[in-house]
Design a protein with these regions (language model features):
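Catalytic cores of eukaryotic secretory-pathway lumenal/extracellular enzymes that build
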Residues: 328, 335, 343-354, 359-361, ...
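Terminal, non-catalytic domain-edge segments
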Residues: 576-583, 590, 595, 606, ...
């Protein structure tokens, strides 16, 4: 028995050694190269280039550790006859296990991370990311860029020294650590998530030992979904991003609560990657009470119900019901012209109603009585002229039983009885004697009840006995939540108007409470308020020089704008609820490009993070302090502050409402992504609703464009894509799957065709002074950048190849311009039919600071993961590298955009890193200064969030 045990032990050892040797192969440029393993140490003799490849593919978050050294071997000499010590190199996450013949340059064809420690005869230590392109003489720029370089002696090879090396590829961040020192900390815009390891050297005697690695899937346990703000329950719809290839049409998903209860879900595709896999997937479900968080998993088969445990669908099969309703506008009934079921799932149904001035969607859910209604008012030419006097949705609610058992309750106030049992004589309801019956016949019955919020800081509650009777009552309050419950002894119905007081003037009125059917009128714009005029604030323009205003004849029109409101019937809760993936997951999947999670390691980190948070708190306070509320205002913020009056310039031309200028929506959204802060969510959501509707045209001559900042949201004559572009709305759409925002993004897909008739540079650079034979003109930024975001969004949402081709044509034609992104004049030739950009002044070079700071920079970051166009991104890198110098040289512009310098530093121009940080930290937007601008706050926050990710280490 002992002899048999010994034999088995020896066989196991031999098997392990054979397996270890079989795990590797040597790819060498010179056949004389050798690799031998003894006592756990592999010795590589490489007269020329050689790679010791590990055959097993690694996947997921990967950590590789080993020890290695270069031996001072007299067989290898320098040109001076000295012993050569060089090239302790490695590849990791390579897309192929070699196969390139051993020659170093041949590996350019692979996608991998490369560290050349002590390369070039032990004079440099360099890190590169290979992208799989073969460089040629014509395209030398395809050669992998040096992303990090050391030349000091401390970071070169010491002969015969065993180095402890650790390689990491975790959540898109790549690190190289040697003897405990991190030499590389690189965020890859296109992370390599699987691949092979290769130990590389040349003209050297190298040794490697104690090789080991671990791979893990951070999403192995599913996607954790958490509440934004307080824990809640009820119907939710949310979006989840996936990396390329992670989920396809055959993927089955399961949703469970934190305590293991299974929840039925509907799911549908929001956006796709170029290979057809899911980029964003939407989910709808009814979350049960007591749920702290949920977990979403991918499965290979349907999940059954555990024995003895009911699924949510078995507990409640009922669907919410939409009460009968009708719509009025300016006290006239607005007929529904079309009704359709837009989506039918096992958990949710979407009903769509369309009319002349409105689009309304109603969402119902199995397992919940809640109905969500999203109503959009569209201002047509008639309403623009007439003005807005009233806008309401009227619901019919059946009433039952005696009047004294009927009631109306507003917010969390005590119920108001239709017939309060208060009389001079005692009422004995149990005895129901003749005195009691007489009292009941003579006690007043109240037929109407009204809650009015005509300002953001005051509401009143009144009631009346019949339609023509006066309203009586003295109930007052400040800010109503816009909730009413109408009920009796049999049933009750509750209504809630989201953002009720913020969207004043609004009101809720109940009529017919004494009859068989009560009418509950939810007035989105209360008829009690003064009529709203869409006219411009003045009859004359005030010029760019005087008031930063660009008013033009006939352009200050509200024809085509919209306003969206949300209403709930029988809401599960009386507060908003949203379930979303964690910031860590969104960050890992690169949702919306490159951004950082909060970093608090160094004093500089604390300074930056505190400043970002203070800017968020500042706008939250300013919204409240200045009362930036109202039906057509809520969600926007002001553009510029007037220190002389100590107030915002609400009455000065282009300095008033902000209208997305310099990416103010993105400022809030990126901070929300990294923090899940419910206060920031509220500001970002409100701004998206406002800017996508009120600042944007949805019909009429300017449909697809938006209005530049002004005293009146639609007052400026500059109607441009930079305001209406899909980029601002992608955040809310992909996180919530909101169909109305989806409609808006679809509306702008072909907005560039308006360039045929509306030239954005018609005044600044008239055609007679800047020759152009193209059918239209635009600027690369912000015009083309805005259109590009529209095309990207339409392509990934619908698969529209026309939009894809326009996007690619624009990218290719920009790289063909003599000066690329700095090609002059500002107004370049453009063909909306093909997407091609041209110039007829090839010798002119010019810079434009608006190009990257109105969403263009963030768009390009996301394009890197969607479009394979290395020439375009190489030209963008050069633009970022040279912008500051060229802006001063060509235009004497000092406009700071430190994220451009940071981008260049991130991609290899390390010397620009200190300049980027100095520019950021020397210009704190809330520091004491003569003026304060939302422009400065937005650009600073976006600079900081990007820089904290890519140039922080």
């Amino acid at each position: 028995m002992n002899r048999l045990t010994c034999i088995l032990f020896l066989l196991t050892i031999l098997s392990l050694k054979a397996t270890a040797k079989a795990d590797w192969w040597l790819e060498a440029e010179d056949p004389a190269s050798t690799a031998t393993t003894n006592d756990g140490v592999t010795t590589i003799i490489a007269p020329k280039g050689a790679t010791w490849w590990y055959k097993h593919k690694m996947s997921g978050n990967t950590i590789i550790e080993y020890e290695a050294r270069i031996v001072a071997d007299p067989r290898f000499k320098t040109d001076k006859g000295e012993t050569r010590v060089s090239d302790l190199n490695c590849f990791w996450m390579a897309d192929k296990c070699g196969g390139c013949g051993g020659k170093f340059a041949n590996n350019y064809a692979l996608k991998l991370y490369y560290m050349g420690y002590g390369g070039n005869w032990n004079t440099t230590t360099r890190f590169r990311r290979y992208k799989g392109y073969w460089p040629t003489e014509e395209k030398e720029w395809l050669r992998p860029v040096i992303l990090r370089e050391y030349t000091d002696k401390a970071h070169l090879i010491k002969a015969d020294h065993w180095y402890s090396i650790r390689l990491e590829a975790i959540d898109g961040r790549v690190r190289y650590i040697i003897d405990g020192e991190c030499l590389v900390d690189y965020v890859d815009p296109q992370p390599l998530t699987s691949g092979y390891f290769g130990f590389r050297t040349t003209l050297a005697h190298a040794e490697i030992r104690n090789f080991r690695y671990t791979c893990s899937d951070p999403d192995n346990d599913g996607v954790r979904l958490e509440w934004i703000g307080n824990k809640s329950h009820g119907p939710v719809t949310f979006g989840v991003p996936y990396a390329v290839g992670e989920a396809d049409k055959q993927t089955i998903f399961s949703l469970t609560t934190n305590d293991g209860r299974q929840i039925d879900t509907d799911t549908w595709r929001l956006a796709s990657w170029a290979d057809g896999s899911a980029k964003w997937q939407a989910f709808s479900a009814v979350i049960p009470q007591g749920t702290d968080y949920c977990v979403l998993r991918k499965t290979d088969k349907k999940i059954g119900t555990k024995k003895g445990r009911q699924s949510i669908r078995e507990e409640n099969e009922e669907w919410g019901e939409i009460p009968p309703f009708y719509l009025t506008l300016n006290n006239k009934v607005m007929p529904v012209e079309k009704q359709e079921t837009e989506r039918q799932g096992k958990v949710s149904r979407l009903h769509k109603y369309s009319g002349r001035n409105c689009v309304m969607r109603a969402y119902t859910y199995k397992g919940s009585k809640e109905v969500k209604i999203v109503h959009t008012l569209i201002v047509d030419s008639s309403l623009n002229t007439e003005g807005l006097r009233e806008l309401s949705i009227h619901f019919k609610v059946p009433m039952h039983g005696e009047a004294y058992k009927r009631y109306v309750a507003f917010d969390d106030r005590r119920s108001m009885s239709v017939q309060p049992l208060i009389a001079r004589r005692k009422i004995d309801m149990q005895a129901m004697d003749s005195v009691t019956r007489s009292m009941l016949d003579n006690i007043a019955q109240w037929d109407g009840f009204r809650l009015s919020q005509l300002s953001p800081n005051g509401h009143s509650i009144r009631k009346r006995t019949y339609p023509d009777a006066p309203w009586i009552g003295t109930i007052e309050g400040q800010r109503s939540e816009g909730v009413v419950t109408v009920g009796d002894s049999v049933a009750s119905t509750t209504f809630r108007m989201k953002d009720f007081w913020q969207s004043y003037p609004s009101s809720i009125q109940v009529d017919g409470a004494r009859g068989d059917t009560a009418i509950v009128t939810l007035s989105l714009y209360s008829p009690e308020a003064e009529p709203y005029s869409f006219a411009h604030y003045d009859s004359i323009p005030h010029t760019l020089e005087a008031a930063y205003e660009d008013v033009q004849p006939g352009m200050s029109t509200a024809w085509g704008i919209a306003r969206t409101s949300t209403i709930y019937v029988n809401p599960e809760t009386t507060t908003d609820r949203q379930l979303l993936p964690t910031p860590e997951y969104l960050h890992r999947k690169r949702a919306f490009g490159i951004w950082s999670l909060p970093v608090l390691v160094s004093p500089r980190d604390s300074l930056v993070e505190n400043a970002i948070q203070e800017i968020m708190s500042f706008y939250d306070r300013e919204i409240e302090r200045n009362g930036w509320y109202g039906f057509f205002n809520y969600g926007d913020v002001m553009h510029g502050y007037d220190a002389s009056r100590d107030e915002w310039r609400y009455d000065v031309g282009g300095y008033a409402w902000d209208n997305t200028e310099l990416a103010s929506p993105a400022m809030f959204w990126y901070q929300f992504l990294r923090t899940a802060d419910p206060v920031v969510w509220r500001m970002a959501e409100a701004m998206t609703r406002h800017c996508s509707e009120v600042d944007t045209y949805h019909e009429g001559p300017h449909a697809g464009l938006g209005s530049r900042h002004n005293v009146i949201h639609w007052g400026c004559g500059a109607k441009e894509s930079r305001i209406s572009e899909a980029w601002w709305n992608r955040f809310y759409y992909y996180l919530t799957a909101d169909e109305r925002v989806g409609d808006i993004m679809h509306e702008v897909a072909n907005a560039d065709t308006l360039l045929y008739i509306l030239d954005p540079m018609r005044l600044a650079q008239p055609r007679n002074l800047y020759p152009c034979s193209a059918p239209a003109r635009l600027r690369i930024g912000p015009d083309w950048m805005g259109y590009a975001s529209n095309w990207l969004t339409e392509w990934e949402r619908t698969g529209n190849i026309v939009c894809r081709d326009k996007l690619q044509a624009g990218m290719t034609s920009i790289t063909s311009l003599p000066f690329g992104f700095t090609q002059g004049p500002l107004a370049l030739g453009y063909d909306p039919a093909t997407g091609v950009i041209t110039t007829e002044m090839p010798e002119m070079e010019i810079t434009n600071h608006l190009m990257p700071i109105m969403g263009g920079f963030e768009l390009v970051n996301e394009l890197q993961g969607a479009i394979n166009n290395p020439a375009f991104f190489h030209m963008w890198l050069n633009y970022c590298r040279d912008y500051k110098e060229k802006a001063w040289l060509l235009r004497k512009s000092k406009f700071r955009i430190p994220r451009l310098q940071a981008y260049a530093a991130w991609h290899g121009y390390e010397k620009l890193r200190p300049a980027a940080w100095k520019s950021l930290l020397d210009n704190m937007p809330l520091a004491p200064k003569p003026s304060l601008w939302t422009n400065d706050c937005a650009t600073w926050v976006l600079d900081a969030i990007f820089m904290q990710e890519v140039v922080n280490k």
